[in-house]
């Protein structure tokens, strides 16, 4: 075990810190985000400001969310950024993004190099505030991006795929090799764009039922739907939805999960 310093900062592995340093990648990400002066830009995990500095050229203010107090102090005293940043020094998992959007008087444009150790949990949290988000651009582990984009009948297809694709149009923007970071991670990364649907292609009457269904179905993904959802649907009820009960969780489409969730919402009281 040894300490790793980057630009004088002690990297905290417990926070999943990997700092982007590749100039070409940074400029490509900013071009994709295409920030405009009047927009509410929010960066998660700004780190040492590698991406922040370039986005700041186009906007008056950026809200940044950073847990590491050493990095907060660095950003607060940054010669270029200090007058442009609204710094939230807190755990991003505890941020109420709906309240933040109301405070900024418009939907949020959220971006960042997400910490590997909380990226999936954070996205599920963000989906709960989706009505207050304009778009999201995230650097993620390539494996997580594969899960976001996965289609049925694929081993990467799961709860994250269904929930994310219900809420958003998702596009792979850029592949990012490990050597673009310091310290160098042991995984490949990619930048993904998520744009919330104004009207979801597959509406759901109660989103909590979709969360429940996908949790049960993918908890033991090798089980048949008949077994994993046996406490919610009979074989006959599944057939009325056009679903063969011997299929497995990964065989059902996003549309089918959404239809099942709406059917369930009609049968079970909303909680």
UniProtKB/Swiss-Prot annotation:
Its EC number is 2.1.1.182. GO terms for cellular component: cytosol. GO terms for molecular function: 16S rRNA (adenine(1518)-N(6)/adenine(1519)-N(6))-dimethyltransferase activity; RNA binding. The keyword Cytoplasm applies. Its main location: cytoplasm. It catalyses: adenosine(1518)/adenosine(1519) in 16S rRNA + 4 S-adenosyl-L-methionine = N(6)-dimethyladenosine(1518)/N(6)-dimethyladenosine(1519) in 16S rRNA + 4 S-adenosyl-L-homocysteine + 4 H(+). Gene3D superfamilies: Ribosomal RNA adenine dimethylase-like, domain 2, Vaccinia Virus protein VP39. S-adenosyl-L-methionine binds at residues 18, 20, 45, 66, 91, 113. It holds the Pfam family RrnaAD. InterPro entries: KsgA/Erm, rRNA_Ade_diMease-like_C, rRNA_Ade_Mease_Trfase_CS, rRNA_Ade_methylase_Trfase_N, rRNA_adenine_dimethylase, SAM-dependent_MTases_sf. Transmembrane segments: none annotated. Keywords: Cytoplasm, Methyltransferase, RNA-binding, rRNA processing, S-adenosyl-L-methionine, Transferase. It is found in: Cytoplasm. Disulfide bonds: none annotated. Belongs to the class I-like SAM-binding methyltransferase superfamily. rRNA adenine N(6)-methyltransferase family. RsmA subfamily. Specifically dimethylates two adjacent adenosines (A1518 and A1519) in the loop of a conserved hairpin near the 3'-end of 16S rRNA in the 30S particle. May play a critical role in biogenesis of 30S subunits. This is Ribosomal RNA small subunit methyltransferase A.
